[in-house]
Structure formats: structure tokens, C-alpha cells
């Protein structure tokens, strides 16, 4: 079991209950899922690019991503409806906690010129979204085997009612927000 999940059960629940005055442990915000999304618009020209993106995402997440397709045609981008333009994966349960641990302990410290994550990236409902410019910050990616540096979006979905509760939850896990 992931150590952050144990920390959540042992200390975070009590800490947040005390801070916000919850009467039941079911009221305490928790991380519901983590979604990784990689937009690969260049895959329209070359199918190999999408295969490489899926391979990278599988290595990072530990499960195979779903290839997302264009919903409608856009002539300006030379995209037709049904073309593969990205991939996404939703992590829940044990895999989610393991990924969250790797993100905090290994990946975020490896970001170049890192000065903390913006606290303004909450969506108003306690969910946090962040972007990563390069996939090589994850230890599962072999630098020599990548064809190009790709970024991705990481969304942490919580059961928090507002941004204040969501931030308190992530702060309890020592999430590196800008001061």
C-alpha cells in the first residue's frame, strides 16, 4: 500500500476534520482520481508519433491509455472527425496513490527551474490541474528512447467542495505550492 494513502488515513483525515470542523470522516475531502492527458496533434501526419506517445503514457501511468479522437473536423488544423489526436488515462485506487507518490517525490523535483506550483490552478470546486512540459521528468521514461519531448496535463480530482478545502488537502501531502 502506498505510504501517502497511509498518511491520509492516519494524519490528514484528523487534521482536516479539526481544521474545517467535520462531524463525519466521509465529509473529509479525498483524492478521487488523477487524470493524465497528452495532446498529440502531430499524430495526424504520422501514426508512429501516436504509438510512441501511448508507449510513454503507459510507462508513466502503469496502465494503457485510451486514444482520444477528434470530435469534429477543423480544416485550419487539417484534422478530420475521428482522427486520433491524443491519449488519456484515469488512475484510481492503488495506482493513483502510487502515481501521486512518484509525482511528489521524484517527478516534480526533477522539473527544470522549478519554483513551486501555482495555487491559482484550482477550478473552483477543489480540483487541481497542472501542466508538465516534458515527460522525461518521470523515471520510467528512458531519455535515449524518446523521439521527442512531449508535455501532458495532470488533473487531480478531489471530493472537496471548494478551492480552500482542496488546497488544504494537497497542502497536507506537502504539495509544493508557490509561497
UniProtKB/Swiss-Prot annotation:
Gene3D superfamilies listed in its UniProt record: 3.30.1440.10
Which UniProt keywords are listed? Ribonucleoprotein, Ribosomal protein, RNA-binding, rRNA-binding, tRNA-binding
Molecular function per GO: rRNA binding; structural constituent of ribosome; tRNA binding
Q: Which domain of life is it from?
A: Bacteria
Give the InterPro entries listed for this entry.
Answer: Ribosomal_uL5, Ribosomal_uL5_bac-type, Ribosomal_uL5_C, Ribosomal_uL5_CS, Ribosomal_uL5_dom_sf, Ribosomal_uL5_N
The keyword Ribosomal protein belongs to this UniProt entry's keyword annotation: yes
Q: Which Gene Ontology BP annotations are present?
A: translation
Role according to the record: This is one of the proteins that bind and probably mediate the attachment of the 5S RNA into the large ribosomal subunit, where it forms part of the central protuberance. In the 70S ribosome it contacts protein S13 of the 30S subunit (bridge B1b), connecting the 2 subunits; this bridge is implicated in subunit movement. Contacts the P site tRNA; the 5S rRNA and some of its associated proteins might help stabilize positioning of ribosome-bound tRNAs.
Cite the record's note on assembly: Part of the 50S ribosomal subunit; part of the 5S rRNA/L5/L18/L25 subcomplex. Contacts the 5S rRNA and the P site tRNA. Forms a bridge to the 30S subunit in the 70S ribosome.
Query: Protein name, please?
Result: Large ribosomal subunit protein uL5
Q: Which organism is this protein's natural source?
A: Shewanella amazonensis (strain ATCC BAA-1098 / SB2B)
Amino acid at each position: 500500500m502506498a505510504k501517502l494513502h497511509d498518511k491520509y488515513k492516519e494524519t490528514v483525515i484528523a487534521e482536516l476534520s479539526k481544521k474545517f470542523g467535520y462531524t463525519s470522516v466521509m465529509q473529509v475531502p479525498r483524492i478521487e482520481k488523477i487524470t493524465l492527458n497528452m495532446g498529440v496533434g502531430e499524430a495526424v501526419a504520422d501514426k508512429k508519433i501516436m504509438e510512441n506517445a501511448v508507449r510513454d503514457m503507459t510507462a508513466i501511468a502503469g496502465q494503457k491509455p485510451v486514444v482520444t479522437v477528434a470530435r469534429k473536423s477543423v480544416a485550419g488544423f487539417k484534422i478530420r472527425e475521428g482522427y486520433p489526436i491524443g491519449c488519456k488515462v484515469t488512475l484510481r485506487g492503488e495506482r493513483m496513490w502510487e502515481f501521486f507518490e512518484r509525482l511528489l517525490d521524484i517527478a516534480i523535483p526533477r522539473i527544470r527551474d522549478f519554483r513551486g506550483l501555482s495555487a491559482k490552478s484550482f477550478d473552483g470546486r477543489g480540483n487541481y490541474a497542472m501542466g508538465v512540459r516534458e515527460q522525461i521528468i518521470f523515471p520510467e521514461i528512458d531519455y535515449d528512447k524518446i523521439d521527442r519531448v512531449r508535455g501532458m496535463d495532470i488533473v487531480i480530482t478531489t471530493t472537496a467542495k471548494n478551492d480552500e478545502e482542496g488546497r488544504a488537502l494537497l497542502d497536507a501531502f506537502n504539495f509544493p505550492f508557490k509561497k
